[in-house]
Amino acid sequence: VIVCAIMLLLLTAYATWLVSRYARPGLWLTVVFAIIGVFAFITWSAAGGLVPVTGLLFGALSLSVPLVFGALGGVIGERVGVVNVAIEAQFLFAAFSSALIASVTGSFFLGLLGAVVAGALVGSVLAVFSIKYLVDQVIVGVVLNVLITGLTSFLHGAILQPHTETLNSPERFPRWPIPFLSDIPIIGPVVFNQTLIVYLMYFIVPLVAWGLYRTRWGLRLRAVGEHPTAADTVGIKVNPTRFWNVLLAGGIAGIGGAYF
């Protein structure tokens, strides 16, 4: 632990030196700092005992999946100029819809599609009120969170609980191990023996990062969010661009809701 603390202090001093020279610390510095910090914490907490590292990493990854999808939805909304505070509402409505559709159809894939549509529907309400009627985006998001929380609680008690066997018994996502990769010690069972939603996360995160900064879609999206007047001047339709991207953000957040 002392060695890790010394290394963290050295990294902090190096980052401070870079900032003092008006240089930007690289991403590698943050990653190394985080790894050493986590290792130091595990070493300290497990002093004199055993820590199941694989189980710890598996639990951390499982808890992070919905947060990642929610963050992706928030990033897209923020970049296009709409503050998406209704991510919790998209999670809840997507989780409810996914469970109901998967139970009725017996297909986890249709349940996932239902979650995407449900998240997009909540996003459409946010888009209509904030873009067309110019209602404060934060207020709309908070109202949607309260509304969907109450609505899903009511529907759960009125529909799902009385018919648990038929309407609240969705098929679970199976785990699909990737050949060879899932056999890697420690990392393999955690990263490469997961469900469809986790694999979608592996795919969507770099796709969104690439799309935002390497495609015409991302350029238009960021232009609308950063300077809508200039974007409108060069012929970009600001409101439709915002509307469809808020729907896209809601659909992505809905995938995180299906994970619940």
Locations of the language-model features?
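Membrane-interfacial amphipathic/re-entrant helices at transmembrane-helix boundaries
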Residues: 1-69, 109
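Alpha-helical transmembrane segments and their helix-start/interface "positive-inside/aromatic belt" motifs
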Residues: 23-30, 132-146
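Structural signal for membrane-spanning alpha-helices in multi-pass inner-membrane proteins
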Residues: 70, 74, 98-102, 127, ...
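Helix-loop-helix "hairpin" substructures at the membrane interface of multi-pass membrane proteins
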Residues: 190-260
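Hydrophobic core segments of alpha-helical transmembrane domains in multi-pass membrane transport
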Residues: 6-16, 33-42, 149-153, 200-209, ...
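Single transmembrane alpha-helix segments in multi-pass membrane proteins
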Residues: 55-104, 110-112, 121-138
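Hydrophobic alpha-helical transmembrane segments
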Residues: 30, 60, 89-92, 109-117, ...
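Transmembrane helix-bundle core of multi-pass membrane transporters
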Residues: 149-213, 244
